[in-house]
A protein has these predicted regions:
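Short hydrophobic core segments
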Residues: 8, 146-156
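Glycine-rich, N-terminal phosphate-binding loop of Rossmann-like dinucleotide-binding domains
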Residues: 10, 139, 155-156, 164
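Conserved N-terminal/central alpha/beta ligand/cofactor-binding core
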Residues: 20, 26-27, 32-125, 178
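Rossmann-like dinucleotide-binding core of oxidoreductases
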Residues: 160-233
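N-terminal Rossmann-fold NAD(P) dinucleotide-binding loop
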Residues: 14
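Conserved beta-strand-loop-beta-strand element in the redox core of flavoprotein oxidoreductases
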Residues: 127-145
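Beta1/beta-strand and adjacent pyrophosphate-binding region of the FAD-binding site
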Residues: 1-11
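Core beta-strand elements of the Rossmann-like FAD/NAD(P) dinucleotide-binding domain
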Residues: 2-3, 141-150
Length: 233
């Protein structure tokens, strides 16, 4: 099977590349190994989009990129799948519902007539001399071969590039985004949680809970006034 563009990886970068190519009229195939689009936002339940807004000392979120990123953020908010942005230190992030993001991503891709999305699909091999000429895919055990004119590897770990034996390059350490541990808390009294966190910042060990904080959080579980989400850097 021939196509104009093959995009490997259905996360934010892959979705943007595939939709942009399809909107230009290119016959595009988007391959995603999981059962939904969205990348780590859906597969790993990373419930906030970081990098959508400029890093600023001043308050007030400013979009870093207009066009498709702004459109996708607006679609999330309109669909009730996101709210914000929310300020976290110098960062502005957009909290979202992972299932809601998957739904909006699916709708966005579905609007493109020349875009074919293949979920539960992995790349098995890449063939070519000096460049990739064909790619073998497996969708739940069914193998197919694609011959694309252009390939975008948005897998997150250069999966196709590695299979092809091509060279890779990485930005210097000081230019890489630091990893974050994302988690959600439910049925927590937010005021008590904020108080405990503020107290922890002034202790000798940030990992040591301030006196009484465990009791306050435990008591909050029983009252459960509302849910909260936090991001730990």
């Amino acid at each position: 099977m021939k196509c104009d563009v093959l995009v490997l990886g259905g996360g934010g970068a892959g979705l943007a590349a595939a939709v942009s190519a399809a909107r230009m009229g290119a016959h595009t195939v988007l391959v995603e190994r999981h059962g939904a689009l969205g990348g780590m936002a859906t597969a790993a339940l990373v419930h906030s989009i970081c990098g959508l807004y400029l890093l600023r000392e001043e308050p007030g979120a400013v979009l870093a990129h207009h066009g498709l990123p702004a459109e996708f953020a607006a679609r999330l908010i309109y669909a009730g799948a996101a709210s914000g942005p929310v300020r976290m230190g110098r960062l502005d992030v957009l909290p979202h519902s992972p299932p809601g993001l998957a739904r909006v991503a699916d709708e966005l891709a579905g609007e493109c007539a020349s875009l074919e999305v293949r979920l539960h699909t992995e790349c098995l091999a890449a063939h070519g001399a000096g460049s990739v000429e064909s790619v073998e895919l497996s969708t739940r055990g069914e193998r197919t071969t694609l011959t694309p004119r252009t390939i975008v590897d948005a897998s997150g770990d250069a999966a196709l590039v590695t299979l092809a034996g091509l060279a890779t390059d990485q930005a210097p350490s000081d230019r890489l985004q630091r990893p974050a541990f994302i988690f959600a808390l439910h049925t927590v009294e937010v005021a008590a949680l904020d108080e405990a966190g503020a107290s922890a910042l002034h202790t000798s060990s940030p990992l040591q809970s301030p006196p009484g904080s465990s009791h306050r959080v435990a008591s909050a579980r029983s009252s459960a006034p509302r849910a909260a989400a936090r991001k730990s850097m």
